Structures are given as structure tokens and as C-alpha cells.
Amino acid sequence: MKKKSFFAVTMSITLLLTLLAGCSDPGAGSGGGPSGGDSAGQTGGEASRLKVAWICDGVLTDGGWNTNGYEGMQKLAEEYDLEVSYQENVPQTDVGDVLRNYASEGYDMVLSNEQYHCEPMVEVAADFPNVTFGCVNAYVSAENMIAFSGTLWQHNYLAGVMSGMVTKSNKLGLITFSTDSDSALTYLSSFRAGAQSVNPDIEVVHVATGSFSDLAAGKEMATSLIDQGCDVVYCNSGDCNATVMELCIERGVYTISAIVDRNGMSDEYVLGSTVNLPSTQLRMMVEGKLSGTHTGNVTPIVGGIEDGIEAFLVNESLQDKLDASVFEAIDEATAEIIAGNVTVELP
């Protein structure tokens, strides 16, 4: 299988940032107020330290989505000498107040790791035109708000292709937080479409944990799927992800990681990892602000595997354990997606 190097992914992000320069409002970020001062990395006079606030709806130690976002912000803070404030466990009912407080306190950027924070963020952003806001995987945006999103289907489609190639029972299991949200249905549609593109007889059994942190529920769902004959189980439900993978490995069943790369958990039973890292989007936001090339976009900008925003990372340890046709199918599907020849019916 052809490997996409870190350099290639980095170049994709760099090219996307360059293209975004043409999408920015030329007047955004100029004038008085917090965002009107010098930013870190600027030349000509003493540069002020960029103040950035970052919030999430869960805990920093979830080992996945929020951990990746938090660690990404820590790296950015060190790399660009940012002054960063972090706040975890922000409930949806408090998002507007938390964002407003940060903006009122003189922060240059106010960022969220949670896509469902984008609606209250748009409302708050209207009252603080000199502050740059940003939301990961946002589906609405504003003139002074940076909004990126992964397609949320391309990497899942590829995971489905690989699962469809390796299954012997023709039955795959998918675990998400719910079974009726748009994101869950997107995961289901794309995973199933990928699998059925190489194996029309595939059935996907979809169940929900109802919680991002109920590990017992995750284990119960995984056990049920395996007992029903699913020989590949894919979980995207927060803290439950690693627990489900551990159970699958114990039971000798193929599994797939969501959000972060957990391929190292097993060189035999982890097929790969669907990666949609918030840290990638956060870096694009901060670097766009620092360079002045991007401080807002009214319409969220969607990027996929070609842009490096999301990816399906095949477990390289399986290269000599699975038939070459498995990896050829993934390569072919990847090329077709990039060429725009793959469509998936989404909610």
C-alpha cells in the first residue's frame, strides 16, 4: 500500500492555509480591540503575546478527541509563545457565557474543541468583531470566526473498505454515542458504503452507548456485537473507544480506532485508525491568525483526506498478514475519493 508521509500531510495543510488567504475578509482583524495589536511572530517592533482561550465539553484526559486538542494547544503555546487558558467540561447551556467572558477579558482568540459549540459561538462573535473565534468541525460560522471541518465520511469509507475485505461473517459492528444524530448516521452511512463497495453482502449492526464515558456500556455493546457474529467492531464513542478495542483484541476480533492513532495496541487485530484530529484544525486556526492570512470565514471550510484534515491510517503491522488485495482496494478507493468519483448518501 502506498504510504502518505507526514511531510505530505504537512504540505497539504500548508497548501490549504495558502488557499484560505483568498477566503479571508481583508478588513477582519484590523483596527482597535484585542485582535488589533501585534501578534506573536510579527516583525517590526516588539510583538505582543497572543492570548488564546480554548474550551471543550468533556475532560482533558479522555485519551482521544479532547486530549488531542489539549495537547495540540500545548504544543502551539510552546511553539509560538502563546498565553493560553484552558477550560474543560463546559456544558452546552454555559457555552455562550464562557465564550463571552473570555472575549470580554481581552483574549485575541477564543476556540472550542466541540462542533456543537459553533451556534452559540456565532451569536457571541457578533458582539466582539475584534476577537477571532474558532470552532473545530463547525457547521456554521461568522465573519470573525474560523470554521473548519472534516468531511466526516471519507476516512470512515476507507475503514469500511478494509473491513469489507477482511470480514468472514459479512457482519460488521459499529458503536457510536447515539444512533440518530447526524454525526452517528454519517459514520454509519459512510462505513457501510465503503464496506458494501467491495462486498455487497455486508450487514452493519449499529448500536449506541448513550455516553462518551460509560466504559461498562461500551464493553457491553462490543460483547453483544461479537456474540451476534460481528468479526470487525468499530467504536467512536469517546472514552469507550480504547475499552472496546481492548475487548476485541482479547476476543480475537478485528477492531478499528477512532479519532487518534491506536494502531500500536495490536499488530494482529487493529486494522487501522480513522483520524480526524482537532489539533490539526486548531493549528490551522492559530497559524492563520498569526500570519494574518485567515481570521474568519462565513461558510465553514471542509477538508478531507487530500487536505490532511482526516485520514485512515492502516496498521502497517498487517502488511505481511493480509492479502495484498486488501491494501490495493484501499489505495483504489483513496484515489477515487480524491478524484471526486465517490459519493455517499449522508443525513
Question: Which residues are covered by each model-predicted region?
Answer:
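A residue-level marker of the well-folded mature domains of exported/periplasmic proteins
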Residues: 23-347
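Bacterial N-terminal signal peptides that target proteins for export
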Residues: 1-11
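Hydrophobic alpha-helical membrane-embedded or membrane-associated segments
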Residues: 13-16
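C-terminal motif of bacterial Sec signal peptides marking the signal peptidase cleavage site
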Residues: 18-22
